[in-house]
C-alpha cells in the first residue's frame, strides 16, 4: 500500500495542543507519537507494551492516551510513545474515527460502523 500523510491535531491531558503531520500506517496497531512530541504534549504513560518494529526488532514502548482531531472529528485514543519514529496514524485510531484507507487515491474515506 502506498504511504501518504495527513494533518491532525493532538492534545495532551493538560490541554497542550500541536498540529502535526501523521504518516498513515495501517500496519501500526496504535497511533505512534515521537518522544519529543509526547513530552511537549505532556503525555502521561499508563503502562508499557512489547512491540515489534518494522524489520522484526523488538522493544517495549510506553502507552498513553491522547486526543486526536482529524478532518473535524475528534477521539481519545491510546498511543505508543516512540523513541525514534515519525508520527504514525495506526489502525485503532482510524477505526475509532470510522475511517479507512483508499490506497489508490491515497486518502482517508469514511466507513460505517458494524454491530454484531
Could you tell me what each predicted segment is?
Residues 1-116:
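Pepsin/retropepsin-fold aspartyl endopeptidases
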Amino acid at each position: 500500500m502506498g504511504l501518504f500523510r495527513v494533518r491532525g491535531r493532538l492534545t495532551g491531558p493538560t490541554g497542550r495542543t500541536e498540529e502535526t503531520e501523521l504518516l498513515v500506517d495501517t500496519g501500526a496497531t496504535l497511533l505512534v507519537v515521537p518522544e519529543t512530541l509526547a513530552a511537549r504534549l505532556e503525555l502521561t504513560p499508563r503502562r508499557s507494551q512489547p512491540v515489534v518494529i518494522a524489520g522484526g526488532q523488538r522493544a517495549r514502548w510506553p502507552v498513553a492516551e491522547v486526543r486526536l482531531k482529524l478532518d473535524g472529528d475528534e477521539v481519545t485514543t491510546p498511543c505508543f510513545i516512540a523513541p525514534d519514529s515519525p508520527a504514525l496514524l495506526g489502525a485503532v485510531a482510524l477505526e475509532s474515527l470510522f475511517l479507512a484507507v483508499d490506497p489508490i487515491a491515497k486518502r482517508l474515506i469514511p466507513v460505517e460502523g458494524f454491530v454484531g
